[in-house]
Amino acid sequence: MKNQHNTFWVLCLLFVMFDETFSAFPFGNGRIQFDPIRENSSDNIECFLDYMELWVPRKQINGLVLWLSQIMRFPVSLSSLDRSNQQLSRCKYFLDADADGNFLFRVHYTGCYVQTQEGFYKLEIHMVKKTSSGRGQSNRYLMRCPAMTAQLGREKLRCDPNYVQVSRPIPLGNSNDQADWFFSLRGELVVSIEDASLIGVEVDVSNSSVTVSGLRGQLLDGIKILDRQIDNLHLWLAHGFYAYSLEASCPSVSQHPGEEVILHIPKQRVGLVKRGSYSADILTLKNLIVGQSANVTVTVTENKQFVVINIPSHEVLQRQDCYTTIGNNPGVQFFYCIDLVLEFTEMAYPINWTLENYYECSVRVPQMIQPKPTTAETFHKIKLELHTTPRSETRTALVITPTQDNTLASTSVTLAAKLRESVHSAIVQESSKTEMSASGYDAELDHVASGEYFNRIEGSGYYAETNISAALRLRKCHHL
């Protein structure tokens, strides 16, 4: 009886060993064995406003590379990451190595195969592993991040002749840990929030917003962008490995703008970014909304760092009474307040941007300027579809200026109640080419190397206004 009992357990053990051994080898030539899907450890994934990032140990990177090569239909190579990332960018993927030889896999929420389910962005990835028999085995992982509100995509900028003020929402939604944050001015001067006055920055922090201000002469640096002199604020709020942009640009100080109002908007992501990573980011303008009175004509120019918008002065300029600094004489001060919403191809959320700019008080009113009375605010939206074909050299300015001639190197864009049914040709100066048409938001996914199309699943997220304290509200312009 004892021998029969031992024989039973031996047979059970052999059966288990047989089952475990052969379950690892799928039947059928070239077939891949899939393990049950599992969520990746929260220690390995980080969620940002526009994208999620997966940390991949170097011992597992070959499995990810094999999977990417299969779905992209071209060989992804770790030895030529720049070339591979050019192809991966078509699906809004990015692969980068860290100092320890491990890798970061970045996926934008609007990338290929990203799905939205129950308030989360999800992407199923496969770590493919080749077995000794040549067959593939795959571990399935689920990258998952919550959809966030777009409150970080708001910026209010006020430029006065003597000082500048920038307001943005708190990047983490509260100010409880503000002691751990510090400012970086011009990439060199680093101080804590409490010591910001040492670099000429006044800080006002609420539960939802941070407002910085200071004298223009201490904070702003004169730079030249597309043959135009501007004053630039290069200020970042940093915390550990992350940074949050407070960059802004003001027009140079003068008594009047001339025939055109020119806005310089730094290209920047709306949420936290890895420190140092923002310098390699390239953002492409996709859509523009102008919150002004009817028939506002806009000329758009962009390069790698800035979006530049030209508006005729008489369409936005206002005036108010003032007293001159010298002599305290009564005069006239010109100003404008402009609301813009900018949408970039590489970002899941728009940027809501407001600029108030005040010129110096002038005793004499220039006759060339006739401010146009503003009426009730009406939004006019142009839907742009831009395709950029970068050349081998660094991408520089895309110049778009009004013209009726197809032989000239530009295209005119008019924001009005009714958009033109078509726009003319556009060629881009220097190192890139852009085609623009009023044809809606979404473009089909570009061809990959094989010439095939991928199914693109948009990570739509959601966009909502936020409740911000009245004292620091990022208000829109008040048009009289």
Curated annotation (Swiss-Prot):
Q: Which key words tag this protein in UniProt?
A: Secreted, Signal
Q: Which InterPro entries match?
A: C1orf127-like, DUF4556, ZP1/4_Ig-like
Q: Which domain of life is it from?
A: Eukaryota
Q: What happens when the gene is disrupted?
A: Knockout animals, generated by CRISP-Cas technology display no discernable left-right anomalies.
Pfam families tied to this protein? DUF4556, ZP1_ZP4_Ig-like
Q: Which residues form the signal peptide?
A: 1-23
Q: Which organism is it from?
A: Xenopus tropicalis
Provide the protein name.
Ciliated left-right organizer protein containing ZP-N domains homolog
Q: In which tissues is it expressed?
A: Expressed specifically by cells of the ciliated left-right organizer.
GO CC, sorted alphabetically, is: extracellular space
- Location(s), subcellular: Secreted
